[in-house]
């Protein structure tokens, strides 16, 4: 039976960072201690209708190719005050920010960066919910692709 406690060679953690810098130099901040997160990549489909043969009544075919790539980030967490201020301001201003999604491998105390995606993103949703009882409120964020691409870079960010 496999050792499920050994996370070496397994994507074990996603780190979501936002460049909150106001000058030319980046100020990467961990979005929050997101305990439930996802990075979703999709690709649209492009179709072209072509006539398969010449002549009246000729059959028509639809050819499909890969279209533009898109992505979204979603997560839920209890927010630290600094992260809440950053996300609240981002939602109010509505601008694009650089987003970095780092894929880590290994145990939470010895994480090794496998690689990361980095590109412009737009904060589309920020909702905060207070559960019943004495539980801590949690925030849900939804970030979507901004202008440009989000290329993959192997290894740890510089």
Named regions from a protein language model:
Residues 74, 102, 142-144:
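Residues within well-ordered beta-strands of beta-sheet-rich folds
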Residues 118-158:
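Mixed-charge, glycine-accented linear interaction segment located at domain edges/termini
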Residues 2-79, 120-137:
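Solvent-exposed edge beta-strands and adjacent loop segments
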Residues 20-23, 107-112, 153-156:
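Polar, enzyme-active/binding microenvironments
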Residues 84-120:
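Short, acidic/charged, Gly/Pro-enriched secondary-structure junctions
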Residues 1-2, 158:
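Glycine- and charge-rich intrinsically disordered segments
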Residues 80-82, 148-149:
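Acidic glycine-/aspartate-rich tracts in secreted/extracellular proteins
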């Amino acid at each position: 039976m496999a050792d499920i406690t050994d996370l070496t060679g397994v994507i074990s953690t996603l780190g979501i960072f936002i460049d909150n810098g106001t000058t030319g130099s980046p100020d990467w901040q961990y979005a929050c201690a997101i305990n439930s997160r996802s990075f979703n990549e999709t690709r649209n489909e492009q179709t072209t209708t072509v006539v398969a043969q010449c002549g009246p009544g000729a059959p028509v075919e639809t050819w499909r190719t890969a279209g533009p790539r898109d992505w979204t980030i979603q997560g839920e967490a209890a927010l630290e005050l600094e992260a809440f201020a950053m996300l609240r301001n981002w939602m109010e201003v509505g601008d694009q920010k650089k987003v970095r999604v780092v894929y880590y491998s290994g145990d939470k105390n010895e994480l090794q960066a496998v690689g990361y995606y980095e590109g412009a993103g737009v904060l589309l949703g920020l909702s905060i919910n207070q559960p019943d009882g004495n539980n801590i409120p949690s925030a849900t964020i939804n970030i979507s692709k901004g202008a440009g691409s989000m290329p993959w870079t192997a290894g740890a960010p510089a």
